[in-house]
Amino acid sequence: MNIVILAAGTGKRMRSALPKVLHPLAGRPLLSHVIDTARTLQPSRLVVVVGHGAEQVQAAVAAPDVQFAVQAEQLGTGHAVRQALPLLDPAQPTLVLYGDVPLTRASTLQRLVDAARDGRYGILTVTLDDPTGYGRIVRDASGFVTRIVEQKDASPEELKIAEINTGIIVTPTAQLSMWLGALKNENAQGEYYLTDVVELAIEAGFEVVTSQPDEEWETLGVNSKAQLAELERIHQRNVADALLVDGVTLADPARVDVRGTLRCGRDVSIDVNCVFEGNVTLADNVTIGANCVIRNASVGAGTRIDAFTHIDGAELGANTVIGPYARLRPGAQLADEAHVGNFVEVKNAVIGHGSKANHLTYIGDADIGARVNIGAGTITCNYDGANKFRTVIEDDVFVGSDTQLVAPVRVGRGVTIAAGTTIWKDVAEGVLALNEKTQTAKSGYVRPVKKKS
């Protein structure tokens, strides 16, 4: 089977410099959703027709299995499909999809393909309560499809028809070439409509069959930011429903966004307003607090992530405790039972088993052993303005509050670092490290007093 995806439109109503098919739905371009669905049907040829912003669109979705045809002038859907003909296998049927219709299920498309076997012409239709703006399916007294009429060209009687054309078709490819060549642009838009091919198919004696999706939203397209927002909500609710079926507890299914792939174990609980981006894995018994953003991360079993935590490119072991208001940046690796608390930032660092950094700390480019306590206000000074250096803290170290570790530096096993210490040299095992300071008390000091107005 050939699959052609039309993605050449200008998308004027989007009011954006970004080509319409590249606007994101669930964090990925609209067109990428359509291509992924097309791939599940295992086509022999997959062709995307580009036009407006062609180079940008091609760069965004380029892949070994995707070919591109260019529609230099926007002369209608029939003209667009004609540009793809040289890339198609004439011996195989062709399925035509749209780059701005991202939610059509593969099962719906397969049903249409099956209905159109043996050289039939298949149309995906849907019956709407309000069909305004769509091409109507015109049938004869026996119920056979005779033609498709566009909204602007429809008679008052035809405008009453509720069954509409979605634009998605399956057609014999060899005949399609002839039919597209016979199209005329004698319509209100002066365009070559792909929908006019159905009349040519009927005239040629081909049987025209129809199929409908399980859900109306499968055929919804995007022509404005409002429609994009509507489809985003539909998609996210579908994702939430699937998570609920899999046993995930969602505090409010309407307030979770998955912009990638979220894999959950048993008894996972997710509070409101959480966003998951890229590839995220949550093992069994993970609890996510409200307003968290988690991107490209793996979270071990029994972990608790408290509210307002941001995690990006991190690996968390089992039974870790994160947040609230913590930030784990790319390269953060936490072993089992590690704690990273409020207003702690970890970047490109390993935190060992049972180690804790509970408050107001920056840990960057560091290797921290097991059972280490990092006091509040500790900073690893890893950057000299040109280069990054690592800090190594071995097992069972106690780091007092307000400590600075100037990398590159190593702190040996079992060291205790006094509060307010700056470490710029390696520290041997088991010692107390501190900066000698003299505390002075001055008598007779009078604190300034505000003047009364």
Swiss-Prot record:
It is an enzyme of class 2 (transferase). Pathway: Nucleotide-sugar biosynthesis; UDP-N-acetyl-alpha-D-glucosamine biosynthesis; N-acetyl-alpha-D-glucosamine 1-phosphate from alpha-D-glucosamine 6-phosphate (route II): step 2/2; Nucleotide-sugar biosynthesis; UDP-N-acetyl-alpha-D-glucosamine biosynthesis; UDP-N-acetyl-alpha-D-glucosamine from N-acetyl-alpha-D-glucosamine 1-phosphate: step 1/1; Bacterial outer membrane biogenesis; LPS lipid A biosynthesis. One of its GO terms (molecular function) is UDP-N-acetylglucosamine diphosphorylase activity. Binds 1 Mg(2+) ion per subunit. It holds the Pfam family NTP_transf_3. Residues 247-453 are annotated as: N-acetyltransferase. Its cofactor is Mg(2+). NCBIfam families: glmU (TIGR01173). Homotrimer. In the N-terminal section; belongs to the N-acetylglucosamine-1-phosphate uridyltransferase family. In the C-terminal section; belongs to the transferase hexapeptide repeat family. This is Bifunctional protein GlmU. It comes from Burkholderia orbicola (strain MC0-3). The gene is glmU.
